[in-house]
Each structure stands twice: as C-alpha cells, then as structure tokens.
C-alpha cells in the first residue's frame, strides 16, 4: 500500500515527531512524494523543528503542514491535547505552492493574490490547501481559481491553532510561515475522490427565490421568506425539528438547477444569519440570486452522522486526509473519534491523518467553497 499514517500523543515534540516518523519509515520507507504534518497547540512553537525532522529522516518530495486545535490519525481524534500526526504517500507527481496577499486590490476591488505558478510539469487534478484565516482571502481566491483553473478541486482547511493574526503556523518544505496559504498540487498519478459532508438534513420542500438582494432573501415562491418558514413550523413539523430551528437554521442552495430531484451533495449549506419580522426577509451566509432553488436545513449529531456515513458508503480508499470542523468532535457528538472512526469503519481503516479546521475547503458540484461544521475528506486510491 503506497500510504502510511501515524499519531503520537507524547507531550515532548522531539519525542512525538520521532515516533511518527519511525512508524512511517517502518510502513512506507523513505522518499514519499508527499508528507502531511499536523501538530496541536502545545507543539506549535516547535513546528519548524518537527518539520525539519520529517524532512531530514523521511526526505519527502513535498512537505506541508500546520498547527491545529485538534488532530486526527488512524481512526482516532485528539482534541485540545498534545498530539502530532503524520501522513505520507507514494503516488506520483506533486508540486508545492505558496500563496499570499499583500492586501492590495485590483480595479474591481478584489484582493490580489500572489504566488500561483505560471506553469507546472503536470496537469493537476486537485489542490491540498492549508491557509491562515486572518491573512488569506480564501473566498476571493476560490472564486478566482474557478475562473482560470476550472475543474481543479480544492480540499483542505484553515489553520486553527492560532487565536489571532500572526499566531498560526504553516509549514512548506523547509520554511514555516505565519500567514498566507501553502499547499500541494496533486498530479494524475493517483485516483482522488472528494467527500464533503455538510452534516445537515432538509426540512420542508424546495422553494424558488423570487426576490433577493445580495445575501438577503426577501421572498420564497412569492411569499415573505420568514412566513414560509413559520408556515412549515405550524403545519405538522416535528417538535424536534422546531427545536433544531431555534438552535440554528440553515439554508441549502441548489447549485445545479438542471436537476429535477435534489439529494445529498446537491446543496451548498449556509447559515441563516437573521430575519426581519417587519418584512419577512432573511439574511444568509452567501450571495443569492433570484431564481435559485433553496431548501431549509437543520443540523444535529444524528444528521451529521447519517450524512457522513451515506456519502462514504460503498467507497474505497488506500489513504485518506480528513479536514473536519473544530465545532464537530465531542462538541457535536456524544462519543470521541467520530469522524475519523466512521472513515475507519466504512473504508477498511485506510492510513488517515487530519485536523480540526477553522473552516473546511471542498467542492460542492463543480465549484470549491469554504464551509463550516463540515467534514471534508480526500480519498486516495492506487490507480494500479
């Protein structure tokens, strides 16, 4: 198998790094094409040393990594405690990438992003991206990328160890950065599948937006948006769903209007930010056009579990990277190790590493998005 992963909870960074590197060497050997390293906050100050050890002993072609609030490895999750997790794979061409923004804007008011390579030695099928949420304009980057690299899938997450500007750490080969974004372009030598589990279930029925402005929905199917929601609640909605609405309502936006029936993976889930009782308008966390089909959604542990299991069912992976939300884990589920455990149980325990992100990256339909409360999974399968 061309993949290996290891997890250590030793509190001393040098010891923990030695443990995970040793396990990778035993299972995979030296010179992997890609190594991915995640460390929790107690190890954050020593990320440069940890990355240096990985490079010296493992000698990967490309190394990427970051600090995180919590991490995952091989079916287990370590939340807010010392941990180092390392993943490596031998699967073909990989190219490192470093992106940043100086804060300058172009004529259209968009922040200019520097660092995208003018060419690569191969045609990339995906980008694994780790970014600093305080300094990198991720939404703008994803929109731009869709224009000049259509079809390139982006998976990854926003670094979560830092609690303010300049506090995060991103590792790329022999350098560590406090801002911007780093990543790896994945070439054609491997089969790569993406799973984006947004953890919600629909309530009511799909409705067409008939009046909207930017991120405010005024009317659904000719009636005030809030009135449509209240109408559903009054007409036989289960008490549990009413409780979940009060805890946090979401809206799913259909991305492919050519479909007749909508199911999991057809909606981009966004939070409902608030409502105006005077006119029935609702503000949501995404720009919405008139004519868009939407459906209200709710989220709880049961729906998040069901969604992830259904999306992973009947899939296969030789290796996996997990980018889950720092609002999941035991903050959402009653038992520890949920997301990593589901991947292990359904996919036959592939070598897995990951981290709890401050925003997860993954495609829905043909476009890449920044998500929240999501589990975004990269599934690698040997093409031979």
Segments (PLM) and residue ranges:
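Small-residue-enriched flexible segments
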Residues: 1-34, 39-55, 60-62, 66-320, ...
